[in-house]
Amino acid sequence: QETLSEETERAEGGSPALFCGDTLFAGGCGYVFDGPMRVMAESLCRLASLPPSTLVCCAHEYTLDNLHFALSLKEEGLEGEALRARALEVIALRAEGKSAVPSQVGLERLTNPLLRAALQGDQGVSFERVRRLKDSRAYRQTSLEALLQS
């Protein structure tokens, strides 16, 4: 069985780096194709237990779409200003042709609604609710720009 220490490596600056494939994304997480949602929630909780400075090196750059979803939730307790600032930063990076990846575990704990839902400690019930909302893509009915202005 893998341990967290086996899943991380030290990055050049001394920060640990997590190479998490399709499990955790900047602002989101991967799809759950089969198996219980609880298992994905448990996996995310393990990753969230890493030090806040741990670099999150995910397999895909979906950050802007994930933050679009996060802004659409208007989730109580989701740090609105931090989320808005992160979205604006990612927009600027993407306009320059740069990636918003890697992220950091601490930033994900603050602004990633799927990770935050997994951390609720309710056997994955909150995570499943938020994951299904993301899967519905209903958030795309409101533009990111409109959400940033609200």
Language-model features: locations:
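Catalytic core of the metallo-beta-lactamase
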Residues: 1-74, 129
